[in-house]
Every structure is written in C-alpha cells, then in structure tokens.
Amino acid sequence: CPGSEHYDPSELEAFYHYKSNPNVLTSLEFERILSASGPTMGHLVRPSDEKEPKKIAWLQCVGSRDTNRCGNGYCSSVCCMYAIKDAMIAKEHAEGDLECTIFNMDIRTFGKDYEKYYLRAKEKAGVRFEKARIHTIDEVGKNKDLRIRYMDRNGELQEEFYDIVVLSVGLQVPASTAELAKRLDVDLDKYNFAMTQPFAPVETTRPGV
C-alpha cells in the first residue's frame, strides 16, 4: 500500500498565507498543539504570541474538491469529521469562551454515527457551521490576526476576524506511487489512484492484482 500524504497549502500561499502567517495552521499542526505530547503540552495557544485564542476558523476542502486551484476534484472523506473532532476538543481545552466556526461547502458525515457526532457538535458543543465560499484571507495589524471575507448562503459578502485559521487539508497520492505503478504494470487514473472498474473496485488493470 503506497499510503497517502496531506496536501501542501503553501502551493496556494497567495490565498491562504500559510507560510507567511504563523497563525494559519494545517489540521495536522493544530492537532499537535492539542496533543499532550505536543509543543505546548496540550495548552491551546496561538503560535504568534502564545496567547489563548478567542475565535478559531476551520476552512474545509483545502486541496480537495477543487479543480480550479489544485486539480484535486475528489473528496478526501476524512476532513469533515476530523475538523468537527478538533473543534470539540479545542473547546474542551480552552480555559475561557472559545468560538469555533467551520466554513464549508457541505458537511459529509457518511460513516456510522457520524451524523450524530456532527449534530452533537452543532447542538450541544456550540460549534458553528457556516456554509460559505471564502473570498479572501488577510492579515490584519501587527498582532497577525486574520480577516476572512466570505460569501454567505444568501449571496452577501461578510467579514469576520479570527485568532487562528486551520486549513483542513485533503489527502493525495504520494508522488512515488507513479513509479511503483509503472513497475507493477498497473494503470492509474488522472489523480494517480489505481484505475478500477465500477463493479470491481478492488481489482486493478493487471490480472491478479
């Protein structure tokens, strides 16, 4: 199994400011902050000044379901649920009130009891789900706060300010997979996944593999 790797948002630096602003994190980096074995031993602070955040935004489908900017048109299938989980854990770790907003095209909760988990986050934990398209992300002031401008579901342009922005990065096939497939004589599709048939989803183009 060739495994997977997460999408590198630095490819879209002009839009996300991932490299230039320390308060823009990938989902994996944010999970390290929440971890007891992480750099802050589980204490929720933002990287730029080590202050506790009051507002955190998650941006879904970074590197997935996007053929205009990154070319990955598929859903990675894990990003929605790990964003919900991280938002709930962040609220548990916060010493004060913490506003968590997940900006999304839609929430895909297709696994067993995933919908219940989503509703628990929304109705009991107070996680806010905003169905919207992100227009721009800007750094505001010397303290490196972030302004998100977005189009809401009514088609109106809104803007909000956040202490941390978490990029829910999708998964993609490692570059080394192409060489492996060539050696095995297995055909790949345009996303470098093994090419299969609709009624034989685990059979490759090479018999017996």
Regions flagged by a language model, labelled:
Residues 1-209:
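Residues forming the flavin
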